[in-house]
UniProtKB/Swiss-Prot annotation:
Protein name: Homeobox-leucine zipper protein ROC3
Organism domain of life: Eukaryota
Organism of this sequence: Oryza sativa subsp. japonica (Rice)
Family: Belongs to the HD-ZIP homeobox family. Class IV subfamily.
Alphabetized UniProt keyword annotations: Coiled coil, DNA-binding, Homeobox, Nucleus, Transcription, Transcription regulation
Role: Probable transcription factor.
Compositional bias of kind Basic and acidic residues: 107-119
CDD domains assigned: homeodomain, START_ArGLABRA2_like
Length: 882
């Protein structure tokens, strides 16, 4: 047993020292140094008597903590220190780098030695055993032992008792030795990590100091751009600096409010539309002052009619330091938003005004709405008399001149409830999926108000959005618009209103120069729930063309001017078809013919076809990202060609050549659709089928019309073998008012197997071709287009005019009966795409352009000939030229 007396241990096992008289000099290797502070204590025998131990008593040796302090630390990396008492946190072992280890004393009081150490009796004379007793207390671990423990330490720095016991048995050590080695090693690693972190922090501190010195030197050298003198006054007191900051802020507030009052007041005696609450919100100072150099109108992204006054030297002072924390980051993020906090109340007031105007326009009749060609067209002059918009950018002179206005209204019943419709309108991605053939791009720039429910977009939601709308032809420029979208629920009527209104002054830096800029006047839809999951939608579309419009081809002048290209009827027809398609996707009682066996395979096939439609529509339109080229200088040439380099998944990688042509045909769009959607009739067109046959192997119905479906066709089923199968994915869609689509693309058998197995089909490459057909009247009442053998041309008087009241406003034929006739023809857009080269960096060969141009011309000629043949020559011939 071990007994503890003060700073010494009594070990009964040291019987070898029995013959010698124990003294202080014999017990310790170094002489004792008397402590004056303890002189009285040591001399007082009554306080604590001290007697030498007899020979039978154990030898006194110092505690291991004291022994550690007296030992000279060995610097060999293979030594480790072990203590009889477990030290918490490895205290004291870190100084020895975990290299020394004391041997334990077993129950028989015999010291343990490593294999290469000699026994103490053989290594030392017996007379020197007392002086060298401490050298028997440690030994060096072998290189093998250290290597094994290091290997386990890398895997598990904190081994449990079982792991330590197993390792000690393998290495011939005691578990306590293994335990203390790991403890010392962890302490050593922590110390090394602390030193490394300290070095990194010191380096960062030095960099920050150098940056601070550099910025201070730059501030001292600031020169006023107006007078050329130093902009910093070194002798300025802190109080004076604060006064100048406050003075600059008040000047900025005064100038900004003056600009806002002038801008939104309307001038000419009109009362300002700003309410007291809006003014109080606008005049609220920001939480952190911006640098005075930025205290002009450029702080706000809006465009103001007046500029801030030029500041002199006295106004340029060192900017206040903005603390770097989450609040400062949020403030800087808010400053980058188009709508600042002080402007939000104004936008909310405008949203309420727009919602009220939309509701009144939906309820109004004549004289606001005039029926022309079966559609309701807005009388723009009557609208201007009935409704006034508080923020009129065109009248203020900073929004650009209005070249033309379009206003239409329509209503329909869709197979979707109001909640799902509202959710789709408030999500930019879902909105694009709901209108794939008209919305090319859409994004939400800023969420101004989240609505009534916290964190959920619902009633009261106010968004700032940007969109690019397209017509499926490169001959009609895409339109880009930045607008606010406001959603409000009328609990009394049980209806929802989605209203868009112009973002006057907030679209700075958001618009592209390559597309037509539009101003979206209060427009939108009112959604009323009906039984069985249906909804009734009343749609109002009101757009203004800003600035100078690009000249249109004669075939499109009347069509675009009447509002048919971007009007309410087209929006509603697309909405009806997509809702019908989504309902069929969710239905489980529709029988699918062919190889489609599971609901997952059916859903994946519909997703793949939807992506094919979206890709086709985006690739044949005049989007701002595409540049189209005419191959001739003739104004009658309607073929446009473009190339693009693709490296993204979903389409073939390489150089893609696209050719598109749009022409007017004197056949109804249903006649043309039936010809192109029927694969058996299309096979008669040699240019489209290459003489091959098509056999349907799968069919998915996605609408009430029998031609609203998705088909998987096998090309030349009789000739190709099972090892060489060619497949064609086709979707056809039609609407009586909105037009028709026939889109198809070749797919690999492996891709179809991936789709059928339920895997993600988004990476399957598709290069779609197809046709877009829209009902339209003849481009001119006096002349119709003529189809030649080489190209498609359109002849007419070329004098189509555009005015603010669609359609064409000509005094000579304002009351002409032809103005009220329904469409007697259609616009056919043919789009073809080929992979010109599989290398994205390859140069385009001119022969490829010539070949695809000839292919498009021949396709239009064969389609026209087939339509004439099917019509039997009666009512199908184009009108002769005048």
């Amino acid at each position: 047993m071990r007994r503890m007396f003060g700073d010494c241990q009594v070990l009964s096992s040291m019987a070898a020292m029995a013959g010698a008289a124990s003294s202080a000099d014999a017990l310790f290797a170094s002489p004792l140094i008397p402590n004056p502070a303890l002189a009285g204590f040591m001399s007082s025998s009554a306080a604590m008597p001290f007697h030498h131990f007899s020979n039978a008593a154990a030898t006194l040796i110092p505690k291991e903590e004291g022994l550690m302090g007296g030992l000279h630390v060995a610097k060999d990396e293979g030594m480790d220190l072990e203590m009889d008492m477990e030290l918490s946190g490895g205290s004291g072992s870190a100084h020895l780098d975990g290299l020394l280890s004391f041997a334990d004393v077993d129950d028989d009081h015999k010291p343990q030695h490593s294999g290469h150490d000699q026994p103490p009796d053989a290594a030392q004379p017996s007379g020197a055993a007392g002086g060298n007793a401490k050298k028997k207390r440690y030994h060096r671990h072998t290189a093998h032992q250290i290597q094994q423990m290091e290997a386990l330490f890398k895997e598990c720095p904190h081994p449990d008792d079982k792991q330590r016991l197993k390792l000690s048995q393998e290495l011939g050590l005691k578990p306590r030795q293994v335990k203390f080695w790991f403890q010392n090693r962890r302490t050593q690693m922590k110390a090394q990590q602390d030193r490394a972190d300290n070095v990194i922090l010191r380096a960062e501190n030095e960099n920050l100091k150098s940056d601070n010195f550099r910025l201070q030197a730059a501030i001292r050298n600031v020169v006023c751009p107006n007078c050329g003198h130093a902009a910093v006054l070194a002798d300025m007191s802190y109080e004076e600096q604060q006064l100048r900051i406050e003075n600059a802020r008040l000047k900025d507030e005064l100038d900004r409010l003056a600009c806002i009052a002038t801008r939104y007041g309307g001038g000419g005696g009109r009362q300002p539309v700003l309410s007291t609450s809006a003014l109080s919100c606008i005049s609220a100072p920001p939480p952190v002052l911006m640098p005075p150099l930025d205290l002009d109108m450029n702080v706000y992204s809006r465009h103001f009619a007046e500029q801030a006054p030029v500041m002199g030297c006295g106004d340029l002072i060192p900017p206040p330091v903005v603390p770097q924390h989450d609040g400062a980051a949020a403030y800087m993020g808010a400053m980058m938003a188009p709508v600042q906090e002080q402007d939000k109340q104004l936008v909310v007031d405008l949203a309420a005004t727009a919602a009220d105007q939309l509701a009144r326009m939906c309820r109004a009749g004549e004289p606001l709405w005039v029926r022309q060609r079966g559609a309701e067209v807005m009388a723009v002059e009557e609208h201007a008399r009935m409704f006034s918009w508080p923020v009129d950018g065109a009248k203020q002179g900073d929004g650009g001149a209005v070249a033309r206005a379009e206003g239409t209204r329509d209503n329909a019943v869709v197979i979707m409830n109001s909640i799902n419709l509202v959710d789709a309108f408030l999500d930019a991605n879902k909105w694009m999926e709901l209108f794939p053939s008209i919305v090319c791009k859409a994004r939400t720039i800023q969420i101004i108000n989240h609505g009534a429910a916290s964190g959920h977009l619902g009633s009261g939601t106010l968004l700032l959005m940007q969109a690019e709308v397209q017509f499926l032809s490169p001959l009609v420029a895409a339109r880009e618009v930045v607008f606010f979208r406001y959603c409000v629920h009328n609990a009394d009527e049980g209806s929802w209103a989605i209203v868009d209104f112009p973002a006057e002054g907030f679209e700075e830096g958001l618009l592209q120069a390559s597309v037509v800029r539009c101003r979206r006047r209060p427009s939108g839809c009112i959604i009323q729930d009906m039984p069985n999951g249906y909804s009734r939608v009343v749609w109002v579309e009101h757009m203004e063309m800003v600035g100078e419009e690009k000249p249109l081809q004669p075939v499109f002048r009347d069509y675009v001017a009447s509002g048919a290209a971007f009007g309410a009827t087209r929006w509603l027809s697309i909405l009806q078809r997509q809702c019908e398609r989504l309902a069929s996707e969710l239905a489980r009682n529709i029988a699918d013919l062919g190889v489609i066996r599971t609901p997952e395979a059916r859903t994946n096939m519909m997703k793949l076809s939807q992506r094919m439609i979206t890709t086709f529509c985006a690739n044949i339109s005049a989007s701002g990202t595409q540049s189209w080229t005419a191959l001739s200088d003739s104004t009658q040439d309607t073929i446009r060609v473009t190339t693009r380099k693709n490296t993204e998944p979903g389409q073939p990688s390489g150089v893609i050549l696209t050719a598109v042509s749009t022409s007017w045909l004197p056949f109804t769009h249903q006649q043309v659709f039936e010809l192109l959607a029927d694969e058996q009739q299309r096979c008669q067109l040699e240019i489209l089928s290459n003489g091959g046959s098509l056999h349907e192997v799968a069919h998915i119905a996605n609408g009430s019309h029998p031609r609203n479906c998705i088909s998987l066709l096998r090309i030349n089923a009789a000739s190709n073998s099972s090892q060489n199968v060619e497949l064609l994915l086709q979707e056809s869609s039609t609407h009586p008012d909105g037009g028709s689509l026939v889109v198809f693309a070749t797919v690999d058998v492996d891709a179809i197997q991936v789709t059928m197995s339920g895997e993600d089909p988004s990476y399957i490459p598709l290069l779609p071709l197809g046709f877009a057909i829209f009902p339209a009247t003849s481009p001119s009442p006096a002349a119709a287009p003529t189809i030649s053998s080489s190209t498609t041309t359109t002849t007419g008087n070329g004098n189509g005019e555009t005015s603010s009241t669609p359609p064409r406003n000509s005094s000579s034929n304002n009351n002409n009966a032809d103005e009220l006739l329904p469409p007697n023809g259609c616009l056919l857009t043919v789009g073809m795409q080929v992979l010109a080269s599989a290398v994205p960096s390859a140069k385009l060969n001119l022969s490829s352009v010539t070949a695809i141009n000839s292919h498009v011309c021949n396709a239009i000629h064969q389609i026209t000939a087939a339509l004439k043949s099917s019509a039997g020559g009666a009512g199908g011939e184009p009108a002769s030229d005048q």
